[in-house]
Design a protein with these regions (language model features):
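Hinge/lid segment of periplasmic solute-binding proteins
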Residues: 34-41, 101, 107, 128-179, ...
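Extracytoplasmic/periplasmic substrate-recognition and gating elements
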Residues: 88, 190, 277-278, 315-379, ...
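Short helix-initiation/N-cap motifs at beta->coil->alpha
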Residues: 99-112, 200-204, 283-297
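Conserved N-terminal structural module of periplasmic/extracytoplasmic solute-binding proteins
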Residues: 9, 20-133, 194, 354, ...
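Glycine-centered hinge/linker elements that transmit conformational signals in sensory
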Residues: 206-211, 254-285
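Long, aromatic- and glycine/proline-rich binding clefts that accommodate carbohydrate-like moieties
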Residues: 374-426, 430, 434
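Short, solvent-exposed loop/beta-turn-alpha elements that line the ligand-binding surface or hinge
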Residues: 144-154, 197-198, 224-231, 247-268, ...
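Extracytoplasmic/periplasmic solute-binding protein
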Residues: 169-173, 178, 203-257, 302
């Protein structure tokens, strides 16, 4: 069995010594852990929790400084409700939120926590958060095994990256998926009938983009058929992956091996290149995701956009959302990806694992999930809430995402790499940009990316 201390050292080696492991790989042994147990109500406990929006460590100050109804105010209000509600359940437990950033900054902070623990100190946090690297941590013994019966109401697909041999080593606070957003004004102006605004297949989406693009060119309009995300690195990969999966591929295959040049992926990349010929031109050179969303939602520069649900809560009336189209006319060939899937894991080195698990149980309850969906618009992970009629009245523009989330049929987030991650995503970005904007044979591009990225793993 893999001991926790051994597992934690392997994480440190993987992070600092650059031991090559792709996050899609399965562990050969399970972490050596047992049941967490129940909360000890006879001692004072401080839970140290890494946090990310909408959990705000400075929520009390924000409630005083921010205007009511703003995003920061709503996030602070959510945090206050969470703290107060948990206090009623466990009066002896104090919640201390620690904001360590996101992405590389977060991963670096977690490396330092692990280093200090290995040097003989205490683990600095009871609960770690993250997205891309959480599966790797779970596979290497960093997290304690949760009582899955306490989290039976959490959607399974969002937990896939931290599920090992049927056991859960983490749960998400909130999640997100990709969908197809569309501009009704542009589609109407281009002469597309309303019943055709929502394409059900790849071919129908491509045809609508062609019609809009040609209409815009003939009538001196500033928009294109689609706003496409070509931001280097992970942003473009998050939008491409649903199409790779719909074609039967992925960046890593089911064995965790690099598969960029697989036949399935080549087919998807060829389709994405076809879409790109009808894109709003400036979207293909834009290097900022927020600017792309601004192009689509505020400037009306595209009829369609492949994007997560986060902007839809405040979108204008002419911006609607729909599921991503299927690859095939018979409805087969569907794909998606969990994104903004904020995972929480209880560290195996924590001295307060029971209280930490109780916090995660409360965080994923339908009561708490309802608060932050109402206040922040992030997709909840509670099955009870997702399947309720009430949720459909809160943010109607997000309902298509909710229905897709409930329908399921997909799991897992973006493929990730522990060794040379920045180099790998830079190489991916160059490759994907060439897919969308160049005339070079895609198989040739994919073979080169396979070799270049493979050399970094």
């Amino acid at each position: 069995m893999k001991l926790f201390k051994k597992g934690i050292i392997s994480i440190l080696c993987g992070a600092i010594c650059l031991l090559g492991v792709a996050c899609g790989q399965k562990p050969t042994t399970k972490p050596d852990d047992g049941p967490i147990g129940e909360v000890d109500g006879n001692k004072q406990i401080t839970l140290r929790i890494e946090s990310a929006a909408p959990l705000k460590s400075n929520y009390q100050a924000l409630l005083r400084s921010e205007a009511e109804g703003t995003q920061l105010y709503n996030q602070a209000l959510f945090t206050k409700r969470l703290v107060d509600g948990f206090k009623k359940k466990y009066s002896n437990v104090k919640l201390q939120f620690i904001e360590d950033g996101w992405g590389d900054a977060l991963f670096q902070a977690q490396q330092l926590y692990i280093r200090d623990y290995n040097a003989g100190g205490k683990m600095a946090v009871d609960i770690m958060i993250g997205e891309t690297y959480m599966g790797y941590f779970a596979e290497n013994g960093v997290f304690a095994r949760l009582d899955k019966e306490k989290f039976s109401d959490v959607i399974d697909g969002a937990c896939a990256d931290v599920t090992i041999d049927g056991e859960r080593y983490g749960v998400p606070m909130c999640t997100g998926i990709m969908g197809l957003q569309y501009n009704t004004n542009i589609l109407s102006e281009a002469g597309i009938a309303e019943e055709k605004w929502v394409p059900s297949t790849w071919a129908e989406l491509l045809e609508n983009c062609r019609i809009v693009s040609e209409y815009a060119e003939a009538n001196n309009k500033s928009y294109g058929g689609i706003v496409m995300n070509n931001v280097a690195g992970m942003p473009g990969a998050f939008r491409a992956t649903p199409f790779l999966r719909a074609a039967g591929g992925d960046i890593l295959d089911s064995d965790g091996k690099l598969a960029i040049n697989s036949e399935s992926n080549i087919e998807a990349f060829e389709y994405l290149r076809d879409l790109a010929q009808y894109a709003y031109e400036d979207s293909l050179t834009c290097d900022n995701e927020d600017t792309l969303q601004y192009y689509f939602t505020n400037k009306n520069y595209g009829a369609y956009m492949i994007e997560g649900q986060w902007s839809m809560a405040s979108a204008p009336d002419n911006i609607k959302s729909a599921p991503l189209p299927a690859k095939n006319a018979d409805g087969t060939g569907r794909g998606n990806i969990y994104c903004g899937n904020v995972l929480f894991g209880v560290t195996n080195a924590s001295e307060n694992k029971a209280a930490a698990q109780a916090f995660l149980e409360y965080l994923t309850s339908s009561e708490v999930q309802n608060w932050f969906y109402e206040l922040d618009g992030r997709l909840p992970v509670s099955k009870t809430m997702l399947e309720s009629e009430e949720i459909l009245t809160v943010h109607p523009n997000i309902n298509s995402y909710i229905k897709e989330l409930v329908a399921g049929g997909f799991d897992g987030g973006l493929s990730c790499f522990v060794k040379n991650a920045n180099d790998i995503w830079s190489l991916w970005g160059s490759f994907y940009s060439n897919v969308l904007t160049s005339a070079t044979d895609i198989k040739t591009l994919a073979d080169k990316a396979q070799a270049d990225i493979g050399a970094k793993i």
